[in-house]
Amino acid sequence: MEKIVCVAGPTASGKTKLAVELAKAYDGEVLSCDSMQIYRGMAIGTAAPTLEEMQGVVHHMIGVADPGEVFSVGKYVELAEPVLQDILSRGKTCVVCGGTGLYADSLLLGRSFAPCPSTGMRETLEAEARQSGIEPLLARLKEVDPEAGARLHPSDNRRIIRALEVYLETGETISEHNRKTKLLPPKHEAVWIGLSFENRQDLYDRIDLRVERMLQDGLLDEIRALLASGISPAATAMQAIGYKEYVDCLTAGGDVHAATALVQQRSRNYAKRQLTWLRRNEQIHWILQPREPDFAAVFRQACTYIPFFA
């Protein structure tokens, strides 16, 4: 089998540390699979690994895109697949690390993407959303694709527009397209290792603490620097949890403590969604940690799932 290990799990579950140690043990390099760590200048708010945390292990797909750029899962796979192939071609282990389940599935399982021709359809739908709001578009989506209409969050403008665009361009709903692609064999055979906690509250406590540490590490200054560099508050990158809330706070003179509580709440909700997504993958070997994790035990257990040697 290919020497690929995917370390997955919700935010603040310890993925970075495990990925680095596995890369060291199996002569590997880390391929980040995070939809926000791909942006430059956002290391604090996205919890991108520091040089110290990397421990000399080569990391890929971190800080490769401008924060003003719209970055999609298709673009990620386009850039990450050659990196993965290069790592393997040199006889090394590729340790994929990240909590963005869609990105990991698309890269390793080979989910194909619905065609996206440049006909102006997306721009037309975006203009409609700006003029009349997203609600009419969501209502149209529910008529043609009830499954997607029920699944997508009412404020997820980008995915609602994308789902409508796919139907209007191809005549096939995005739900049907996704069902077909899931029937295809995996593109890569990987060992999947999932990290979480025995008690969900322990994970939530770690998330709350992480947000507080981000503030201490200079998250607000990081956001100010992004805004000063000309990045629009409406940019996709600035809609990330931990940025949107503080951008609103900084630009509107809001209360930092209230914004912090909101970031913590949304981060906990996001972790719950991450777990829901990942638990659909029956290939994942889950390691559930106690409140005070024993990393040595976690590492030993992870190694038992890896059938190849460095």
Which positions does each model-derived feature cover?
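Phosphate/pyrophosphate-binding catalytic cores of soluble transferases and nucleic-acid-acting enzymes
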Residues: 1-310
